[in-house]
Amino acid sequence: MRKVALITGASSGIGKETAKLLVQQGYTVYGAARRTEKMQDLEQAGVKLLAMDVTDDAAMVKCVDQMLQAEGRIDVLLNNAGYGSYGALEDVPMSEARYQFEVNIFGMARLTQLVLPQMRKQRRGRIINISSIGGKLGEPHGAWYHATKYAVEGLSDSLRMELKEFGIDVVIIEPGAIITEWAGIAREHMLKTSGNTAYGELTRKHAAMFERADKMGSQPIVVAKTIVKAITANRPKTRYATGGGAKLILFVKSLLSDRMFDSLMLRMMKQTDRQVWTNSFLPK
């Protein structure tokens, strides 16, 4: 019997690449996104498309019901849909802050609620939650985004213990800098929100760093391969840091005090070459 996987945010980047790999592995894959017109290549590859907005409860219920009626099972849920809108905390409207939580946390949690009854019935399943190294550290202008990713980490750790007796694994994926449309969207929002406020100078420096980091990031396929490894492993790790210098950055973070890491982050924004970490490793 073919295993069934549901992937959110499948219209681009990590979600799209993971869908392709799982089809090649013999999975029945449902790819969900708001923009199904961007998934025609996935449909041709054998992915079944679902129009889903993770902030729309009725749409999520409908899609899960449709999938379960057709397949009778769900083996993997990849909570990949995400949204990043940067700006100084003082400048970001509360409506925008709430929307980030709706997409990155509440949508993830609700979709998980919807698939869990079937997974418990099967007494097996795997939930893969896309976090970020941003769930382990902060940076200027990212207060709301990082808050959502810290929440993903805490939610996943608690859920893992709740589901152990049912044979359901919960795995956290922590990507570093990845070349996707996400960075461009976050950069654009940051400049629009704080580029001409009291935080303007730091904002412009940060935006320039985003542009450099995007060029040095890993391709989405790097993270997708890690996700497939987590899905297919007999006993997966509880979390995987992957791509875009993720392991190095988290290692450096573990060595430094909070104030030392703050200084490192702020100094990185002044760098103009690829030696950001070498030049900035220790405070001067």
Briefly describe each language-model feature range.
Residues 165-214:
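C-terminal beta-strand-loop-alpha-helix "lid" module of Rossmann-like NAD(P)-dependent dehydrogenases
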